[in-house]
Curated annotation (Swiss-Prot):
Red blood cells. GO terms for cellular component: blood microparticle; haptoglobin-hemoglobin complex; hemoglobin complex. InterPro entries: Globin, Globin-like_sf, Globin/Proto, Hemoglobin_b, Hemoglobin_oxygen_transport. Heterotetramer of two alpha chains and two beta chains. The modification Phosphothreonine is found at residue 12. Involved in oxygen transport from the lung to the various peripheral tissues. The lineage of its organism: Eukaryota, Metazoa, Chordata, Craniata, Vertebrata. GO terms for biological process: hydrogen peroxide catabolic process. This is Hemoglobin subunit beta. GO terms for molecular function: haptoglobin binding; heme binding; hemoglobin alpha binding; metal ion binding; organic acid binding; oxygen binding; oxygen carrier activity; peroxidase activity. Belongs to the globin family. The modification S-nitrosocysteine is found at residue 93. The modification N6-acetyllysine is found at residues 59, 82, 144.
Length: 146
């Protein structure tokens, strides 16, 4: 991902204030509610029968934290996202058979959640930088697909 120095500062500055557990759980939960067909990858998580069940599900929250921890690692390697996410790309492609479009959807949901959490601090410039990052991460995660 090519970011200007200003964009990198905006992304890392805001990310330093992110509660990975809260934002990760909310982002994954929203993905599962807004795009219910994504729930098929999480059948082992138990009750996903309603929006409140999804948003209150501890396994959704835990996996959301795991997802955002990996995203956080990617922010430290913006110049090598494909390398950073190579193993996760392989896992999601070969073993889990996740549709790579879901990575793009989750990235967009993450941007919504960040905007919700940070309000006025999530300026159009910050959003623009984050859109580049989530697109880059989605592309890196889709890299191993044939």
């Amino acid at each position: 991902v090519h970011l200007t120095g200003e964009e990198k500062s905006a992304v890392t500055g805001l990310w330093g204030k992110v509660n990975v557990e809260d934002v990760g759980g909310e982002a994954l939960g929203r993905l599962l509610v807004v795009y219910p067909w994504t729930q098929r990858f999480f059948e082992s998580f138990g009750d996903l029968s309603s929006p409140s069940a999804v948003m209150g599900n501890p396994k959704v929250k835990a996996h959301g934290k795991k997802v955002l921890s990996a995203f956080s690692d990617g922010l430290n390697h913006l110049d090598n996202l494909k390398g950073t996410f190579a193993k996760l790309s392989e896992l999601h492609c070969d073993k889990l058979h996740v549709d790579p479009e879901n990575f793009r959807l989750l990235g967009n949901v993450l941007v919504v959640v960040l905007a919700h959490h940070f309000g006025k601090d999530f300026t159009p410039q910050v959003q623009s930088a984050y859109q580049k990052v989530v697109a880059g991460v989605a592309n890196a995660l889709a890299h191993k697909y044939h």
